[in-house]
Amino acid sequence: MRFIGLYGTFGTKRYLLDSKCTTKPHLFIHSILATLKKPFIDQSEPVWLDGPGSRSFELVFALKVFWEFIRGLRALHFSGPCITVFGSARFKEGHRYYEEARQVSHKIASELGFTIMTGGGPGIMEAANRGAREAGGRSVGCNIELPHEQSQNPYLDKFVTIRYFFVRKVLLVKYSYAFVIFPGGFGTMDELFETMTLVQTKKIVDFPIVVMGTDYFKPLQAYLHFMAKEGTISPEDLNLVLFTDDADAAVAHIQHFIAHNYTVKRRRPSWWLFEKN
């Protein structure tokens, strides 16, 4: 008997058996073996798709992460206190958001005396570091290794390049007393929402978040209000972020938070530990 269009199953794959395979079983076996020689998945990311590795592999990975933290902590230990500025790497000099980031960072450095910290790259990051430098303030960056290398901008007094995004985000929060968010893409949204989550869950407290660019973030504001309406966040959570276009209002908001919650002082290096500022 010949079955046209019969399905056979082998492991997790299904095969359509044509008339030749059903009448000649050896052809069916040959077709399965030929298929098994082909990769089931894209081999471009084998590390992430292999699942748990050996104990030695996991230990080496943990040590690499630990070393990244040590490098970052040592490099940035005397950089603070900082205000961290986030935003797109794609805006060029002369763009509205580039110039606004430059202005806000200039005011923070000159009026509040904080170090400006960024991701160390181009665009908004460059503008923020540039504003701090022009104000005579300190300017530092925590860069990230990418497949298409993101070089540090020329306005950094100190920088460190980190391999892992999650290590970098910890460092950007650790030395900061506030975040200023400018328009950006996935990375900027990731940093914004992670910080909002940390504040909402009390992992960090009394941490002002200022979002600059009300036109750009108008859909986000609407979505946050929708979330509050649906009950997935509390109405009070809407107060975690200040949306504004006013540089003076942004600086005043940060100053109010810090004046009422912190005594800020810069750490000094210890000569007996061979530390450098």
Locations of regions flagged by a protein language model:
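Fold-independent oxyanion-binding glycine-rich loops
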Residues: 87-89, 119-120, 142-145, 162-165, ...
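Acidic/glycine-enriched connector segments
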Residues: 123-182
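Amphipathic, Lys/Arg-enriched alpha-helical "gate/interface" segment within cytosolic domains
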Residues: 32-46, 76, 147-159, 166-169, ...
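Glycine-rich beta-alpha loop segments
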Residues: 28-42, 46-142
